Amino acid sequence: MREIIQEVLPSFNSNKPFALATVTRTWSSAPRPVGAAMAVLESGEVIGSVSGGCVEGAIHEASLEVLKTKTSQSVTYGVSDDNAFAVGLTCGGTIELYIQYVDQSSFPDFADIAAKIEDKKAVAVATLVSAESGIGARIVLTKSDASGSLGNTQLDHAAIEGARALLNHGTTKTLKLGPNGENRMDDV
């Protein structure tokens, strides 16, 4: 998101919604790393890239659906998907993304995050992208404070601890935590 946040900020500040697609997981030779982001504005304009062009068309369509329904979703494209070649994932590998609906009411911290990034301050966003319920819940954190919740205190504590470790190392990663914050190999 860091790469595109200043370009989408005018839309946010004008309360014009957009869909924000973020790479949450990759396998094999996916073209972009976890954390790569692409925004699709209401006009259909695309800002950023999540796959180096491999599946942008399919993600654009999914993003327009998110804008229409105002419902965030996770999507996966890969070599095991019969439609992978059809959507352009000819480079191999698998890519999983979380596409979220963003406007001033759904993501009120967005402008503050943009300001911190502009000021070169460390900031992280932990978003619940896979769970029985609560998809889209988030915690915004810096090295010294955090706001928001993923749904319960134990999960919040584990997410903050994990995200701070990543923040301190300047890296991005998908944390796999259970509903009570336990580390897991599978999804929540």
Question: Which residue ranges define each predicted feature?
Answer:
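Segments forming oxygen-rich coordination pockets for charged ligands
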Residues: M1-V188
